[in-house]
Amino acid sequence: MADRNLRDLLAPWVAGLPARELREMTLDSRVAAAGDLFVAVVGHQADGRRYIPQAIAQGVAAIIAEAKDEATDGEIREMHGVPVVYLNQLNERLSALAGRFYHEPSENMRLVAVTGTNGKTTTTQLLAQWSQLLGETSAVMGTVGNGLLGKVIPTENTTGSAVDVQHVLASLVAQGATFGAMEVSSHGLVQHRVAALKFAASVFTNLSRDHLDYHGDMAHYEAAKWMLYSTHHHGQAIVNADDEVGRRWLASLPDAVAVSMEGHINPNCHGRWLKAEAVEYHDRGATIRFASSWGDGEIESRLMGAFNVSNLLLALATLLALGYPLTNLLKTAARLQPVCGRMEVFTAPGKPTVVVDYAHTPDALEKALQAARLHCAGKLWCVFGCGGDRDKGKRPLMGAIAEEFADIVVVTDDNPRTEEPRAIINDILAGMLDAGQVRVMEGRTEAVTNAIMQAKDNDVVLIAGKGHEDYQIVGTQRLDYSDRVTAARLLGVIA
């Protein structure tokens, strides 16, 4: 379908269409231009069919719209000389449509999906870094942004729309990408945004409380994640056997690679496996000895904490499953860099060690604090808040975790959005046994500054919740703010 025309694009579903050339594909009538294909989907907030007249006025070449029902699937109408094709269950078909439009980019690179509550960003970054060290031209897609390694452009969502995903992949292929590592969110799976992608491998990191404002309960959240393996072309399956959900899934995925730090591996049951034999944590990171069905080895890592060792082992197992030689992986492992805003360490002589992390769920906060404790000779500080207009149930849980695992807790704002900041803080304090010992400071800049200035040089200050983000949402305003930049400025170093 070299010239991208309407007849060839819809050939698997609809016959009798004109071979009208199409310039670009868009879901947004505001940016639709002459020669484009406008796709009018029925979304959660708006019905795209209402904007068909606007798209026609802007000169689009053709329109695909959601059909009223199964009976009208494939119906073709003409409005002001523009063909309008109606398809039933358009959202479910959108990934396949966009895949055809952009010439199936996922088939022209090695694309790895990474899903799970925590660890997606670090694991995708490690996969991209490591594969590039082995000669690939690697790209990432996810929370931090999309692009070739080192040229990432920030994005709004972990997983973009079905059209965005295929468009970005096509752009990456055009730039020469041969390997891609992509974060896949539960929203993205439920909303069919990656439905037609051909993954070479799919990685599951872990599952813990998050997004229950969207999914309702943990059962539905787990079901959303499981879709990657049950309804998608998942390729090689790599699963964290230390996670209870992961162990359950491994029973249904007999060909999966089981990965463990805690001994949850039975070589007689798991044909392919990788497990940590010994891990030594030190001020520079960790030394990891491992065994696997591919052979044994040792890695010096600059990453902090046990959960990052798990992320590293998942990345290693994935690349082994894809056929990269163990000897080459071991030779290049020491060159892997820490990930921006993910247990990122800032140090300066005579100042406390500051760690900036994206932890914004109960499980992630606990793991971040446990990781920081491994590298802390003095007091462990925790500065954090919770996002407004999001799952309120996790707030007291995170308060309890901070109180249990940190020596000094500073509760502040995260992204309060349209909620009253003090109300969010009170929800956090409600989970604590002795809230009177907690330091409360609403302004995040002031809270971070106060903690770093008061901490001693052998203390560790964990600033949790925002990680790589360079903004704060207050009300409906997006304000410039970065934990990384604030910490670096106070320590007199460069972020």
Curated annotation (Swiss-Prot):
Cellular location(s): Cytoplasm
Binding annotation for meso-2,6-diaminopimelate: 390, 414-417, 465, 469
Membrane as UniProt keyword: no
GO cellular component: cytoplasm
Catalytic activity: UDP-N-acetyl-alpha-D-muramoyl-L-alanyl-D-glutamate + meso-2,6-diaminopimelate + ATP = UDP-N-acetyl-alpha-D-muramoyl-L-alanyl-gamma-D-glutamyl-meso-2,6-diaminopimelate + ADP + phosphate + H(+)
Predominant subcellular localization, coarse grouping: cytoplasm
Any GO molecular function: UDP-N-acetylmuramoylalanyl-D-glutamate-2,6-diaminopimelate ligase activity
Motif (Meso-diaminopimelate recognition motif): 414-417
UniProt pathway: Cell wall biogenesis; peptidoglycan biosynthesis
Binding locations of UDP-N-acetyl-alpha-D-muramoyl-L-alanyl-D-glutamate: 27, 29, 44-46, 157-159, 185, 191, 193
EC number per UniProt: 6.3.2.13
UniProt record, GO biological process: cell division; cell wall organization; peptidoglycan biosynthetic process; regulation of cell shape
Record key words, sorted: ATP-binding, Cell cycle, Cell division, Cell shape, Cell wall biogenesis/degradation, Cytoplasm, Ligase, Magnesium, Nucleotide-binding, Peptidoglycan synthesis
Pfam families hit by this protein: Mur_ligase (PF01225), Mur_ligase_C (PF02875), Mur_ligase_M (PF08245)
Enzyme class: ligase
Post-translational modification: Carboxylation is probably crucial for Mg(2+) binding and, consequently, for the gamma-phosphate positioning of ATP.
Positions in coiled-coil regions: none
Family: Belongs to the MurCDEF family. MurE subfamily.
Protein name: UDP-N-acetylmuramoyl-L-alanyl-D-glutamate--2,6-diaminopimelate ligase
Organism, scientific name: Salmonella choleraesuis (strain SC-B67)
Source organism phylogeny: Bacteria, Pseudomonadati, Pseudomonadota, Gammaproteobacteria, Enterobacterales
